[in-house]
Amino acid sequence: VLKVGQNLKYDRGILANYDIELRGIAFDTMLESYILDSVAGRHDMDSLSDRWLKHKTITFEEIAGKGKNQLTFNQIALEEAGRYAAEDADVTLQLHLKMWPKLQQNEGPLNVFKNIEMPLVPVLSRVERNGVKIDPAVLHAHSQEIAKRLIELEKKAYDIAGEEFNPVSYTHLRA
């Protein structure tokens, strides 16, 4: 069964806490939004609903409160939680139905979505959950190589400019 969601990387992490692996992820409206308009500002469901559907959603703060007295989802009355969750699912599907046709109009962004962004969802979810092992010796060796290369590039820049300057100074670079 193919699934549509909003911020599925987060959902995968939550479900993993209960040893549930989310499979069949096909579409993520947060990623669709990023690809369609990466500079649009916020890509959370409430903002996307307002932007794409002209619909103001029930916010989590409306049902849970805010600050130190904010309730957790399992403390919210079932009727309120159900209304919130149902709207969340409905809005997510409506967003997908609006954005997906737009994404399909351009092969480049569609390719990024299908072949890069979506396959990365489970990978990044696991990385966030488990971390990444790093070999300190290899990291140190790379750091030394980069530092050496940086010195070489600075010398080359000085030769081109005919004088030494601070390469991280906007004022020096402008002059």
Where are the regions a protein language model picked out?
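Active-site-proximal helix-loop-helix substrate-binding element of RNase H-like nuclease domains
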Residues: 1-105, 116, 124
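Short His/Asp/Glu-rich catalytic/ion-coordination signatures at enzyme active sites or charged loops
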Residues: 73, 119-147
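A structural signal for well-ordered alpha-helices, especially hydrophobic packing surfaces
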Residues: 96, 100, 124-127, 131, ...
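Short, charged alpha-helical motifs in flexible N/C-terminal segments and linkers
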Residues: 166-167
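Conserved small/polar residues in nucleotide/adenosyl-binding loops
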Residues: 171-175
